[in-house]
Amino acid sequence: QELLDVDGEILRNGGSYYILPAFRGKGGGLELAKTEGETCPLTVVQARSETDRGLPASIWSPPRIAIIRPGFSLNIEFRPRNPSACHRESSLQWKVEEESQQVKIAVKEDARGFGPFRIRPHRDDYKLVYCDEGQKR
């Protein structure tokens, strides 16, 4: 089965996409925000406005394959056109913090091998899941 974007195009390994809710009126895309005393926005959150697409994200699988399929282990990394000064020391690659279970961005020295995120079919759309040691969270 192929994963398709909102334009009906096949998801490409390393492609840049906006991650949006499946239904209108449920908020916007994903972006970064400051939480819990952070001095820079490091937490992945959903934009409140449905007209805000959020930040573009690169979705890639470590194996060098052209097309992303359901269940592949994926890394996700924001790729803003103009990163802020706060993010020059960050990779913008997603990681899940064990204690809080929040999705954050990684500092450069922690940046590789975080996944595994997966895209799974869900009803007529897809859901993004985090898997740790084969367990869905």
Curated annotation (Swiss-Prot):
It holds the Pfam family Kunitz_legume. Signal peptide: none annotated. Inhibition of trypsin. GO terms for molecular function: serine-type endopeptidase inhibitor activity. Heterodimer of an alpha and a beta chain linked by a disulfide bond. PROSITE patterns: SOYBEAN_KUNITZ (PS00283). InterPro entries: Kunitz_inhibitor_STI-like_sf (IPR011065), Prot_inh_Kunz-lg (IPR002160). The record marks R64, I65 as: Reactive bond for trypsin. Belongs to the protease inhibitor I3 (leguminous Kunitz-type inhibitor) family. This is Kunitz-type trypsin inhibitor alpha chain. PANTHER family: KUNITZ TRYPSIN INHIBITOR 2, TRYPSIN INHIBITOR A. Keywords: Disulfide bond, Protease inhibitor, Serine protease inhibitor. It comes from Neltuma juliflora (Mesquite). Disulfide bonds join C40-C86.
